[in-house]
């Protein structure tokens, strides 16, 4: 027997309603995936259960891209329509509020998914997309971290080179100043030695020459008083010799 037509009304039995929802949801997601592959269409599907759980499907890697595309398209259509009354303005504000509220809820839900929370309502395909997004984000984070570390290392190397060059220049200046100070010190010492040279000692005569009056012929020994001049002169009288000879002949 063929399958009969299902009557379109609310299922009163909670268990049957939950089972039907699970089956129909899986079929709906499958059909959305098939039409996106076969027709190369951009498909997004959002389903809330009667308990408030969210189920979604997106042919793109990120649901936000599809929603942004939809928002741009709907905004462009609204711009073509000229509002003619205050009622239209109020309606636009209500639509904008609903849109922003839905977007905030979607962002909060995605944030929970990125943190590993509330994953029970996500299908395998969605988990795979989430995993790919996290891997891509992790690669970007690691690449940025490595770039910052490389830049920091290069900065430290340049700083080290500058410090070494500065130290070398300071050491050279210190050596030059020390050389100048040593030169000034040597010049000062030479000038001091030239100003304090001891007088040359006077030559001293032999004491025998100084005490012998016969070696000072009519002169005066340096250091003697003038009264010794008469004593130092050579006595050339022959009286003692003459007296000596007379005594010899007398004998």
Curated annotation (Swiss-Prot):
Record domain K-box: where: 90-180
Residues crossing the lipid bilayer are none
Xref: InterPro entries: MADS-box/MEF2_TF, MEF2-like_N, TF_Kbox, TF_MADSbox, TF_MADSbox_sf
All residue ranges annotated as the MADS-box domain in the record:
1-61
Which tissues does the record link to its expression?
Expressed in some of the meristems of arrest-stage broccoli heads.
Q: Does the keyword Nucleus apply?
A: yes
**Annotated Pfam families:** K-box, SRF-TF
What does the entry list under GO cellular component? nucleus
Q: Which GO terms describe its biological process?
A: cell differentiation; flower development; positive regulation of transcription by RNA polymerase II
Which key words tag this protein in UniProt?
Answer: Activator, Coiled coil, Developmental protein, Differentiation, DNA-binding, Flowering, Nucleus, Transcription, Transcription regulation
Q: Where in the cell is it found?
A: Nucleus
Instruction: Cite the SMART domains for this sequence.
Output: MADS
Q: Spell out the residue ranges making up region: Disordered.
A: 183-207
Q: Name one GO molecular function term.
A: RNA polymerase II transcription regulatory region sequence-specific DNA binding
**Additional observations:** CAULIFLOWER may contribute to the shape of the floral meristem. This trait has likely been selected by early farmers during the domestication of modified inflorescence structures.
| Protein purpose | Probable transcription factor that promotes early floral meristem identity in synergy with APETALA1, FRUITFULL and LEAFY. Is required subsequently for the transition of an inflorescence meristem into a floral meristem. Seems to be partially redundant to the function of APETALA1.
- Quaternary structure and partners: Homodimer capable of binding to CArG-box sequences.
Q: Which PANTHER family match?
A: SERUM RESPONSE FACTOR HOMOLOG
* Record-given protein name: Transcription factor CAULIFLOWER
Q: What is the lineage of its organism?
A: Eukaryota, Viridiplantae, Streptophyta, Embryophyta, Tracheophyta
């Amino acid at each position: 027997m063929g399958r009969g037509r299902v009557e379109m009304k609310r299922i009163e039995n909670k268990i049957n309603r939950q089972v039907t929802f699970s089956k129909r949801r899986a079929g709906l997601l499958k059909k959305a995936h098939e039409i996106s592959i076969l027709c190369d269409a951009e498909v997004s599907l959002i389903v809330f259960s009667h308990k408030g759980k969210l189920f979604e499907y997106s042919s793109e890697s990120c649901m936000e891209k599809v929603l942004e595309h939809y928002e741009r398209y709907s905004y462009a259509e609204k711009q073509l329509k000229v509002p003619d009354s205050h009622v239209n303005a109020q309606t636009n504000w209500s639509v904008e509020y609903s849109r922003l509220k839905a977007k905030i809820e979607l962002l909060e839900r995605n944030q929970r998914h990125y943190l590993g929370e509330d994953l029970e309502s996500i299908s395998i395909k969605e988990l795979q997309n989430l995993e790919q997004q996290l891997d891509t984000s992790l690669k970007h984070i690691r690449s940025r971290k490595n770039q910052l570390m490389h830049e920091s290392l290069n900065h430290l190397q340049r700083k080290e080179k500058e410090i070494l060059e500065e130290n070398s220049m300071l050491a050279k200046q210190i050596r030059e100043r020390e050389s100048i100070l040593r030169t000034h010190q040597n010049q000062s010492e030479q000038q001091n030695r030239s100003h304090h040279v001891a007088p040359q000692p006077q030559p001293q005569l032999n004491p025998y020459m100084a005490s012998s009056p016969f070696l000072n012929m009519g002169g005066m020994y340096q250091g003697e008083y003038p009264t010794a001049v008469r004593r130092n002169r050579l006595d050339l009288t022959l009286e003692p010799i003459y007296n000596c000879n007379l005594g010899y002949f007398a004998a």
